[in-house]
Curated annotation (Swiss-Prot):
<dbReference type="GO" id="GO:0016168">
    <property type="term" value="F:chlorophyll binding"/>
</dbReference>
<feature type="transmembrane region" description="Helical">
    <location>
        <begin position="279"/>
        <end position="300"/>
    </location>
</feature>
<comment type="subunit">
    <text>PSII is composed of 1 copy each of membrane proteins PsbA, PsbB, PsbC, PsbD, PsbE, PsbF, PsbH, PsbI, PsbJ, PsbK, PsbL, PsbM, PsbT, PsbX, PsbY, PsbZ, Psb30/Ycf12, at least 3 peripheral proteins of the oxygen-evolving complex and a large number of cofactors. It forms dimeric complexes.</text>
</comment>
<keyword id="KW-0602">Photosynthesis</keyword>
<dbReference type="InterPro" id="IPR044900">
    <property type="entry name" value="PSII_PsbC_sf"/>
</dbReference>
<keyword id="KW-0157">Chromophore</keyword>
<feature type="transmembrane region" description="Helical">
    <location>
        <begin position="435"/>
        <end position="459"/>
    </location>
</feature>
<keyword id="KW-0793">Thylakoid</keyword>
<dbReference type="GO" id="GO:0009535">
    <property type="term" value="C:chloroplast thylakoid membrane"/>
</dbReference>
<dbReference type="GO" id="GO:0046872">
    <property type="term" value="F:metal ion binding"/>
</dbReference>
<feature type="propeptide">
    <location>
        <begin position="1"/>
        <end position="2"/>
    </location>
</feature>
<keyword id="KW-0479">Metal-binding</keyword>
<keyword id="KW-0604">Photosystem II</keyword>
<feature type="transmembrane region" description="Helical">
    <location>
        <begin position="57"/>
        <end position="81"/>
    </location>
</feature>
<feature type="modified residue" description="N-acetylthreonine">
    <location>
        <position position="3"/>
    </location>
</feature>
<feature type="binding site">
    <location>
        <position position="355"/>
    </location>
    <ligand>
        <name>[CaMn4O5] cluster</name>
    </ligand>
</feature>
<comment type="similarity">
    <text>Belongs to the PsbB/PsbC family. PsbC subfamily.</text>
</comment>
Length: 461
């Protein structure tokens, strides 16, 4: 029996002798074969899009309209619902057909990508430089590399504008802050003021500041996409039309592995930011679909017990808790009236069900006594019992279930997965950056392939 280990089946130009990389080094064998590397990337895109389509249809098939999305372990339908597809007032799903269409479109796209990937991996030209010079490249050709960078930036900018167009012209997006409990609406009055948009970038990442993660209205989010899309498109045109300056030519390493390390570093940053965004932000990730944030569940519990004990006759304005601080209400470091108890650390929380009860100095005691609506009680009781805690040690006072409840919030899944992937990508960034710098300095040739242990082992056959 022949295997890829003994080389006879390895395709020309992709074996260990030609490339210096064994089969398990993956795309490293294709560093200088632009046509085959194209095939690998297109096939990979096909796998990604196939997963998206198949998982999308799987979630549609299992979806129960009577239960909230976050109780059903869904991670794709909440994204479609946030874009305004298939939902109505209060985030209620009124039509699952758009979700079905999304899944089918992704499956069809994946078939096209899969065909293209297989074609370029097996049948297409090994290198593109001769037949298709526009698509060909040499890794150390700085001008070509920045042109490719520019094309990528333009595509990213167009992607940002897709969200803008959806929000402005194609039915709008879901706004958790819409009056009456959230609804799909067109975003008409965009925030384009640079002081507001770029002010987010200058905020502290801590506490009540929260950097860009603190954004809490859709006008700012869509306006930010206008700015970002414009910057990406203009930057892309700039990189296509210009050559790298001398300082950039000197400062950067210009090799395939260096570009890989830059990309992994960028994706790592994206992963960490996405982790914080999905964990803390209930505007871009509405609680109706993703479940409450951790702070939101904690504040919801404090609110629920305030409502209960107030009905039982407690004076919530003056009752003292076991620490001598207010049991239900207390003051924040800056003087606002906030919920007391362990949830005090989450006094920054803003949520659509709570804001109507605030006055100019924090929570308004007269509103808490007279204006609490049944929908606010229902919402907070629901959120209190669906905290995204998993097995965190510090739960902000939320009563935790140990045996009975089988519930993991999509926020937990999405935040954890993006943190872990962000960390792994960061390690990959360090690894490939180190190798690329060493290779550029001329003292790193990789592992000595002549004395690898595997070469002295008995062949598998």
């Amino acid at each position: 029996m022949e295997t890829l280990f003994n080389g006879t089946l390895a395709l020309a130009g992709r074996d260990q002798e030609t490339t210096g990389f064994a089969w398990w080094a993956g795309n490293a064998r294709l560093i200088n074969l632009s046509g085959k590397l194209l095939g690998a990337h297109v096939a990979h895109a096909g796998l990604i899009v196939f997963w998206a389509g198949a998982m999308n249809l799987f979630e549609v098939a299992h979806f129960v309209p009577e239960k909230p999305m976050y109780e059903q372990g869904l991670i794709l339908l909440p994204h479609l619902a946030t874009l305004g597809w298939g939902v109505g007032p209060g985030g209620e799903v009124i039509d699952t057909f758009p979700y079905f269409v999304s899944g089918v479109l992704h499956l069809i796209s994946s078939a096209v990508l899969g065909f293209g990937g297989i074609y370029h991996a097996l049948l297409g030209p090994e290198t593109l430089e001769e037949s298709f010079p526009f698509f060909g490249y040499v890794w150390k050709d700085r001008n070509k590399m920045t042109t490719i960078l520019g094309i990528h930036l333009i595509l990213l900018g167009l992607g940002a504008f897709l969200l803008v167009f959806k929000a402005l012209y194609f039915g709008g997006v879901y706004d958790t802050w819409a009056p009456g409990g959230g609804d799909v609406r067109k975003i008409t009055n965009l925030t384009l003021s640079p002081s507001i948009i770029f002010g987010y970038l200058l905020k502290s990442p801590f506490g009540g500041e929260g950097w860009i993660v603190s954004v809490d209205d859709l006008e700012d989010i869509i306006g930010g996409h206008v700015w970002l899309g414009s910057i990406c498109i203009l930057g892309g045109i700039w990189h296509i039309l210009t050559k790298p300056f001398a300082w950039a030519r000197r400062a950067l390493v210009w090799s395939g592995e260096a570009y890989l390390s830059y990309s992994l570093g960028a994706l790592s940053v994206f992963g960490f930011i996405a982790c914080c965004f999905v964990w803390f932000n209930n505007t871009a990730y509405p609680s109706e679909f993703y479940g409450p944030t951790g702070p939101e569940a904690s504040q919801a519990q404090a609110f629920t017990f305030l409502v209960r004990d107030q009905r039982l006759g407690a004076n919530v304005g003056s009752a003292q808790g076991p620490t001598g601080l207010g049991k239900y209400l207390m003051r924040s470091p800056t003087g606002e009236v906030i919920f007391g108890g362990e949830t005090m650390r989450f006094w920054d929380l803003r949520a659509p069900w709570l804001e109507p009860l605030r006055g100019p100095n924090g929570l308004d005691l007269s509103r808490l006594k007279k204006d609490i609506q049944p929908w606010q009680e229902r919402r907070s009781a629901e959120y209190m019992t669906h905290a995204p805690l998993g097995s965190l040690n510090s739960v902000g006072g939320v009563a935790t279930e140990i045996n009975a409840v089988n519930y993991v919030s999509p926020r937990s899944w999405l935040a954890t997965s993006h943190f872990v992937l962000g960390f792994f990508f960061f390690v990959g960034h360090l690894w490939h950056a180190g190798r690329a710098r060493a290779a550029a300095a001329g003292f790193e040739k990789g592992i000595d392939r002549d004395f690898e242990p595997v070469l002295s082992m008995t062949p598998l056959n």
